[in-house]
């Protein structure tokens, strides 16, 4: 494993310097391109709720200054001598992972996201001991293992959030058999219609599932049905609507990050139904045992995805023309966008125009 300790490249970016979370211009150093590395000119970077948690140190682990961003797309400007899969000019992306041990059981199965030594794209510790900086910056140096190709059919701006939101829902949908050919016609419930939820709806429809959106907001029904082509919409606070859906769904993807009870949601599953949690509430969710026991139901969780799955997902998105619905923001409006993101005032993902052209 080649390590490149010489951080000599000066890079301009945007960072939070303290728990106020205010993003300011920040000049820092990145490592030189190593033999296994790919240097990328950043074009676009999506804004994730995780960025909010890190800039405000909500989890008590932020290492300031922190340069956020793990939904990164751009163009290759340099490749190392050991890099065979990429060349200068390629359209590429980098998601949540900067490094892993490459040798454990998880890495050997391309489940790098579950490696004990995983290093995140930002606020992580890289192999050489340096702190990782994310995609709110003009360029990035990434190990070849953690770079994916972006199909020519996908715009770089709308593809960026797929590297987090997309893979976060794709991975469990694949692992639990929702995207297999024989799953067509089965019934999927998507709890929450935000950055993750709207992509889950798109995957479900692309693979022939009957999709029901489950939301606390009646105002989202038109959006779900008309724009995302959901087959059904249920207001989770309406007891009559929820009771009418009892034992009707084969699968449920719960994308909600707010604390909520899983009991009413579990009742919507058929016997042997599967509920997958991908949202991360700050407080524990309520999980009653009776709906599990009497319905032989399964609850599981999932955290992003490995690199093989991420490339597979991106290729499928290229084939089915699946992208995220986004709002482009300029670098001088990052703080405004973060404030709106904190209020969930976005449909459905902000993407920073770092150095790109939305027509790419």
Swiss-Prot record:
One of its GO terms (biological process) is lignin biosynthetic process. Keywords: Lignin biosynthesis, Metal-binding, NADP, Oxidoreductase, Zinc. It is an enzyme of class 1 (oxidoreductase). Binds 2 Zn(2+) ions per subunit. The keyword Oxidoreductase applies. Its EC number is 1.1.1.195. It catalyses: (E)-cinnamyl alcohol + NADP(+) = (E)-cinnamaldehyde + NADPH + H(+); (E)-coniferol + NADP(+) = (E)-coniferaldehyde + NADPH + H(+); (E)-sinapyl alcohol + NADP(+) = (E)-sinapaldehyde + NADPH + H(+); (E)-4-coumaroyl alcohol + NADP(+) = (E)-4-coumaraldehyde + NADPH + H(+). One of its GO terms (molecular function) is coniferyl-alcohol dehydrogenase activity. It holds the Pfam family ADH_zinc_N. Its cofactor is Zn(2+). Zn(2+) 2 binds at residues 101, 104, 107, 115. Pathway: Aromatic compound metabolism; phenylpropanoid biosynthesis. NADP(+) binds at residues 50, 168, 192-197, 215-220, 255, 279, 302-304. CDD domains: CAD1. Zn(2+) 1 binds at residues 48, 70-71, 164. Homodimer. PANTHER family: ALDEHYDE REDUCTASE (PTHR42683). Involved in lignin biosynthesis. Catalyzes the final step specific for the production of lignin monomers. Catalyzes the NADPH-dependent reduction of coniferaldehyde, 5-hydroxyconiferaldehyde, sinapaldehyde, 4-coumaraldehyde and caffeyl aldehyde to their respective alcohols. Belongs to the zinc-containing alcohol dehydrogenase family. This is Probable cinnamyl alcohol dehydrogenase 6. It comes from Oryza sativa subsp. japonica.
């Amino acid at each position: 494993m080649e390590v490149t300790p010489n951080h000599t490249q000066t890079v301009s970016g945007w960072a939070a310097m303290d728990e106020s979370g205010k993003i300011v211009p920040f000049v820092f150093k990145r490592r030189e391109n190593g033999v296994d590395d790919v240097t990328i000119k950043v074009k676009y970077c999506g804004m994730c709720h995780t960025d909010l948690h890190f800039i405000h140190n909500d989890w008590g682990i932020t290492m300031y200054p922190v340069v956020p961003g793990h939904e990164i797309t751009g163009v290759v400007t340099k490749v190392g001598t050991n890099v065979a899969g990429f060349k200068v000019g390629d359209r590429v992306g980098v998601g949540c992972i900067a490094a892993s041990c490459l040798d454990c059981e998880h890495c050997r199965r391309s489940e790098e996201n579950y490696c004990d030594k995983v290093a995140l794209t930002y606020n992580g510790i890289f192999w050489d001991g340096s702190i990782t900086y994310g995609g709110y910056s003009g360029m990035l140096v990434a190990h070849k293992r953690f770079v994916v190709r972006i199909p020519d059919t996908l715009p770089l701006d709308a593809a960026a959030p797929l590297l987090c939101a997309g893979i976060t829902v794709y991975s469990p949908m694949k692992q639990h058999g929702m995207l297999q050919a024989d799953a067509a016609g089965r019934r999927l419930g998507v709890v929450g219609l935000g950055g993750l939820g709207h992509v889950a709806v798109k995957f479900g429809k692309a693979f022939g599932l009957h999709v029901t959106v489950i939301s606390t907001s009646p105002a989202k029904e038109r959006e779900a049905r008309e724009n995302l082509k959901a087959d059904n919409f249920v207001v989770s606070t309406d007891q009559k609507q929820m009771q009418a859906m009892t034992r009707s769904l084969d699968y449920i993807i719960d994308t909600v990050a707010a604390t909520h009870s899983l009991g009413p949601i579990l009742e919507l599953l058929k016997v042997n139904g599967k509920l997958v949690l991908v949202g991360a509430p700050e407080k524990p969710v309520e999980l009653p045992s009776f709906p599990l026991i009497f319905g032989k139901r399964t609850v599981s969780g999932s955290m992003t995805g490995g690199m093989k799955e991420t490339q597979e997902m991106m290729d499928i998105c290229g084939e089915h023309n699946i992208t995220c619905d986004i709002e482009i923001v300029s670098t001088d409006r990052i703080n405004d966008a973060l404030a709106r993101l904190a209020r969930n005032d976005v449909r459905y993902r902000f993407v920073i125009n770092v150095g790109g052209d939305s027509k790419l």
